[in-house]
Amino acid sequence: MRSASKTRITGETSIELSINLDSQADSTISTGVGFLDHMLTLFSKHSRITLNVKADGDTYVDAHHTVEDVGITLGLCLKEALSDKASINRYGSSYVPMDESLGFCALDLSGRSYLVFDAELTNPKLGDFDTELVEEFFQAVAFNTEMNLHLRVLYGKNTHHKIEALFKAFGRALREAITINPEIKGVNSTKGVL
């Protein structure tokens, strides 16, 4: 079973996070940031990854530290759960429509960290949530998983729909990339290591 758990405590946040890549049990997500909980629930459903998160952060300041630290911890758990990445597809991509918006994600579990984020989020806030934190979250995930992650909103009007399309596309692309393929012997690289 490919799984991992991490506890990350800083002067700003306390995060407990666990994942299971091969289980579709119900996820429990409580970050203290309602919009992030909603997006992580969508990610869990569409990636078919069991995700449990308990986060306490300095949300009286704003949600920045909590969102970023949850992304860091999720990335570290993904890296550990994937271990040597033997027999996984490695690459994944997905287009996801959400009403008038269309999101796209392509990723490579290459061991090299990179984020391309191309999304015009015209509404700077959704409730109390600063929409610029979406990019911060994905930056933290990509750099701590050590993946190439490309996210793009091709078009759309509603900022909530755009972000939702990105999280769903990320989940679906990640599921494709982490799926074990019996045709792949060892790691999916001519280098022999990822």
Curated annotation (Swiss-Prot):
Keyword Lyase: yes
Signal sequence bounds: none
SUPFAM superfamilies membership: Ribosomal protein S5 domain 2-like
Lineage: superkingdom: Bacteria
Pfam family, one: IGPD
EC number: 4.2.1.19
Compartments where found: Cytoplasm
Catalytic activity: D-erythro-1-(imidazol-4-yl)glycerol 3-phosphate = 3-(imidazol-4-yl)-2-oxopropyl phosphate + H2O
Any GO MF annotation of the entry: imidazoleglycerol-phosphate dehydratase activity
Keywords: Amino-acid biosynthesis, Cytoplasm, Histidine biosynthesis, Lyase
Recorded family membership: Belongs to the imidazoleglycerol-phosphate dehydratase family.
Listed name of the protein: Imidazoleglycerol-phosphate dehydratase
Species per Swiss-Prot/TrEMBL record: Listeria innocua serovar 6a (strain ATCC BAA-680 / CLIP 11262)
Gene: hisB
